């Protein structure tokens, strides 16, 4: 296999909340409208930003992370995208240099130039100092330039532009506008399907970008070929039911791809709307927002009975975060409303007003060693003894429990299944 060349940018910022998702989505929508094939990636383990970016580009969005995804798998994803795209966009995470690994680490590793998005709404000449710091903090960092966001007027944009050193390219400015805002929830953005006017917002952002910013394709980046890896069909003939609806939507596209590459047939179903399970051998219950759908979930008795029968028959279930909460005795929301859940795992969970856990996790299971992350606002009390506990690579004390009851495996951890394909197959193989 040989290297592939494709124009690429990594959209980063000095901090969260600067508008990375808006700018990345606007670039994706603008170039897609021009007939270009755009592939978008997201740094880190986030679920919600990729939903918006997939809508903007018309293509599935994958995560890139030097630890959770791994360097070799990240290389493969970028190389494959370069073979089918006219433009690759990567949205960073947090601030450009924040975290270990950071967005800057990814940019350096794969030679992708950084476009820094800076919220200029409350600054003038300091904009140039901030841009200079981002460019020069790591001299070896490939740096494309800066784009100002939430600019108050044409004159304000000119002041920001003129504050830049000559060595930093000005990509333009996006005006402050409610028409382009992407509402947020505690995990970041709301889910794409919850925004009835999302396409109008994306088009408005793309229009504004076309009028006030540089929109030519960036220079091509050479993406090295990955090491070829072959997967045995360990799940050949296995039918896996995957919950996917407004309550359970936190799915890594890479997880679905892996299960299919292992030979599984995926059948999607809705615990909110379906009265019965499809004919499946295994179940995958991902995370989401079950606390926002307590009544609908608790009132769907036929679905609850079907999942209980699946478990009683000794069939595999993998439940992550919100999927695990659905299997408890009960769940209480922030308004102190409690609902009966499925009762397959002893315990109660209660939603908290603040974040309860945020960390990368790696856990050793009998089936293998899986990586992933945890991010939740609930607290769980259960008498069940954990099968194992996760470890955080960044020295945080977070150590999420993994519970097992028969063939049911449940945890707050959102697993990145390609981190150990053999373990993924063993968890879901009948």
UniProtKB/Swiss-Prot annotation:
What Enzyme Commission number(s) does the record list for this chain?
6.3.5.9
Record-annotated GATase cobBQ-type domain positions = 239-422
Q: What residues make up the catalytic site? A: 321
Which key words are in the record? Answer: ATP-binding, Cobalamin biosynthesis, Glutamine amidotransferase, Ligase, Magnesium, Nucleotide-binding
Pfam families with a match to the protein in the record = CbiA (PF01656), GATase_3 (PF07685)
Q: Which GO terms describe its biological process?
A: cobalamin biosynthetic process
Annotated pathway:
Cofactor biosynthesis; adenosylcobalamin biosynthesis; cob(II)yrinate a,c-diamide from precorrin-2 (aerobic route): step 9/10
Name the reaction it catalyses: hydrogenobyrinate + 2 L-glutamine + 2 ATP + 2 H2O = hydrogenobyrinate a,c-diamide + 2 L-glutamate + 2 ADP + 2 phosphate + 2 H(+)
Query: GO molecular function terms here?
Result: ATP binding; cobyrinic acid a,c-diamide synthase activity; hydrogenobyrinic acid a,c-diamide synthase (glutamine-hydrolysing) activity
What domain of life does the UniProt record list for this protein's source? Bacteria
Per its UniProt record, the required cofactor names are:
Mg(2+)
What SUPFAM superfamilies does UniProt report for this protein, alphabetically? Class I glutamine amidotransferase-like (SSF52317), P-loop containing nucleoside triphosphate hydrolases (SSF52540)
Keyword Oxidoreductase found:
no
Sites marked Increases nucleophilicity of active site Cys: 414
Task: Report the function annotation for this chain.
Answer: Catalyzes the ATP-dependent amidation of the two carboxylate groups at positions a and c of hydrogenobyrinate, using either L-glutamine or ammonia as the nitrogen source.
Q: What else is known?
A: The a and c carboxylates of hydrogenobyrinate are activated for nucleophilic attack via formation of a phosphorylated intermediate by ATP. CobB catalyzes first the amidation of the c-carboxylate, and then that of the a-carboxylate.
Q: Which NCBIfam families does this entry report, sorted A to Z?
A: cobB (TIGR00379), PRK01077.1 (NF002204)
The family line of this record is:
Belongs to the CobB/CbiA family.
PANTHER family for this protein: COBYRINATE A,C-DIAMIDE SYNTHASE
Q: What is known of its domains?
A: Comprises of two domains. The C-terminal domain contains the binding site for glutamine and catalyzes the hydrolysis of this substrate to glutamate and ammonia. The N-terminal domain is anticipated to bind ATP and hydrogenobyrinate and catalyzes the ultimate synthesis of the diamide product. The ammonia produced via the glutaminase domain is probably translocated to the adjacent domain via a molecular tunnel, where it reacts with an activated intermediate.
- Supply the name of the protein: Hydrogenobyrinate a,c-diamide synthase
**Species this chain originates from:** Stutzerimonas stutzeri (strain A1501) (Pseudomonas stutzeri)
Encoding gene, per UniProt annotation: cobB
């Amino acid at each position: 296999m040989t290297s592939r060349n494709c124009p690429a940018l990594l959209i980063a910022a000095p901090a969260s909340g600067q508008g990375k998702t808006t700018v990345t989505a606007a670039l994706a929508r603008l170039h897609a409208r021009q007939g270009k094939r755009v592939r978008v990636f997201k740094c880190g383990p986030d679920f919600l930003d990729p939903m918006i970016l997939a809508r903007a580009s018309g293509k599935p969005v994958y995560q890139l992370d030097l630890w959770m995804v791994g360097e070799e798998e990240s290389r493969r994803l970028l190389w494959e995208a370069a073979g089918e795209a006219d433009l690759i966009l990567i949205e960073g995470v947090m601030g450009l240099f924040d975290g270990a690994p950071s967005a800057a680490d990814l940019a350096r590793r794969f030679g992708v130039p950084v476009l820094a998005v800076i919220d200029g709404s409350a600054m003038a000449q300091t904009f140039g100092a901030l841009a200079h710091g981002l460019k020069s903090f790591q001299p070896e960092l490939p740096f494309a330039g800066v784009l100002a966001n939430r600019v108050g007027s044409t004159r304000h944009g000119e002041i920001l532009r003129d504050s830049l050193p000559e060595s930093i390219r000005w990509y333009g400015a996006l005006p402050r506008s409610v028409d382009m805002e992407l509402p947020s929830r505690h995990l970041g953005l709301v889910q794409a399907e919850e925004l009835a006017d999302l396409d109008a917002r994306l088009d408005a952002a793309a229009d504004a970008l076309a009028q006030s910013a540089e929109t030519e394709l960036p220079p091509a980046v050479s993406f090295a070929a990955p090491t070829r890896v072959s997967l045995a069909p360990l799940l050949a003939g296995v039918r896996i039911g995957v919950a996917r609806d407004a309550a359970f939507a936190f799915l890594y596209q890479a997880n679905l791809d892996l299960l299919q590459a292992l030979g599984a047939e995926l059948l999607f179903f809705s615990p909110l709307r379906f009265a019965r399970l499809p004919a499946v051998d295994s179940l995958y219950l991902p995370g989401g927002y079950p606390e926002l759908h307590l009544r609908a979930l608790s009132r769907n008795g036929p679905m609850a009975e079907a999942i209980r029968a699946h478990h009683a028959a000794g069939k595999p279930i993998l439940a992550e975060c919100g999927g695990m909460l659905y299997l408890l005795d009960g769940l209480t929301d922030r308004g102190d409303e409690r609902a009966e859940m499925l009762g397959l795992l002893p315990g109660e969970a209660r939603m908290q007003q603040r974040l309860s856990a945020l960390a990368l996790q790696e856990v050793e299971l009998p089936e293998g060693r899986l990586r992933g992350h945890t991010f939740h606002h609930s607290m769980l009390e259960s008498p069940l003894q954990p099968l194992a506990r996760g470890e955080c690579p960044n020295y945080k004390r977070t150590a999420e429990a993994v519970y097992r009851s028969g063939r049911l495996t449940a945890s707050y951890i959102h697993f990145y299944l390609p981190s150990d394909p053999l373990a993924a197959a063993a968890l879901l193989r009948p």
